[in-house]
Amino acid sequence: MSKLNMTPREIVAYLDEYIIGQKEAKKSIAIAFRNRYRRLQLEKSLQEEITPKNILMIGSTGVGKTEIARRIAKIMELPFVKVEASKYTEVGFVGRDVESMVRDLVNNSVLLVENEHKEKLKDKIEEAVVEKIAKKLLPPLPNGVSEEKKQEYANSLLKMQQRIVQGELDSREIEIEVRKKSIEIDSNVPPEILRVQENLIKVFHKEQDKVKKTLSVKEAKEALKAEISDTLLDSEAIKMEGLKRAESSGVIFIDEIDKIAVSSKEGSRQDPSKEGVQRDLLPIVEGSVVNTKYGSIKTEHILFIAAGAFHLSKPSDLIPELQGRFPLRVELENLTEEIMYMILTQTKTSIIKQYQALLQVEGVGIAFEDDAIKELAKLSYNANQKSEDIGARRLHTTIEKVLEDISFEAEDYLGQKVTITKELVQSKLEDLVADENLVKYIL
């Protein structure tokens, strides 16, 4: 069931579990996502008139721009795609054209809908798989047998199915027929070429062609699950629903938008295709029709969230028409030493919890003293100040450095609980951070 009806307060509360600070950014994005729900409650004629208010997020790398958008799209089960503006080229140049981001969104949307339909049919699919395997393991019943024999066979089949479900026969081998693996199609090529590719595949690689394979029961379960899913699912309905959902509630996150801004300071040294990419992007953000392999999609109701650091350029360096299409602007705060500490201690799946869980797999307990966590936050913050500011990502590199030896020699610590102290953190990191020339080694 979709969680599109979450209130802005609920959205912000959810984000607070994973992202520290950035209240204004969370608030703006929460309202934008809530408006998606509000629009869908209106009459059809009015829905068409209301377009989303696109957002421009301004902030350094690692402060939570992508994470905010990604987390909301995930919890609300919306079609979402993250792209980097710098990867696109102007029409006529070699590279990806901007329309491919819409095609990627539609692909993700169809996959999202397909997974939902599979979940609904999960029990039915598993029953069909188990029944098919059981009939392979049991010799077939000869014709003309008595009702008593038929009942005995039915009982044996039921017992066999129970054993398969419990995994008792996972290592047994059986021969089954499976479809030939389909050829992957590149979704980044224009729709016209996609159709040619699909037609060629139908000619040279018929879907109904099957091959016999000897697999273990465990492997056969997975192979048959995919095949039976395709049989039970209404692929046409899934495609149509995926297309509709991408059109009405899709979200495209465009990172590094500042990389295609033409700075007035740089002048003639700028890449001439940057402005071309902006002009190609403009009709998609304004609202146009893009052809995909699933059909045409209108883009005027897709929510676009652009983000960039804008260190070498300003938002005003974007072409005026594109600026006007991102009416909501949010500036994200740089991370302080205190926020670094809170990221390590207060987030639901903090980096510390992640490393503790990873090493627990090896039977090694890890405990961090509070002073050690504060020192990690302090040294990570100092490293950001002295070198390139990569925000919270710096914490990954510093913790990795501190735990490097323990991770490598995990078997030596089996059954032990290792305490990470302030002194240990300092011994691993302070020499590197103190020397500005060596700070690059912990990037």
From Swiss-Prot:
SUPFAM superfamilies xrefs: P-loop containing nucleoside triphosphate hydrolases
GO molecular function, one term: ATP binding
Binding-site list for ATP: 20, 62-67, 255, 321, 393
Main location: cytoplasm
Any GO CC annotation of this UniProt entry: HslUV protease complex
SMART domains, A to Z: AAA (SM00382), ClpB_D2-small (SM01086)
HAMAP family (UniProt xref): HslU
Family: Belongs to the ClpX chaperone family. HslU subfamily.
The protein's name: ATP-dependent protease ATPase subunit HslU
Native source species: Helicobacter pylori (strain HPAG1)
Gene that encodes it: hslU
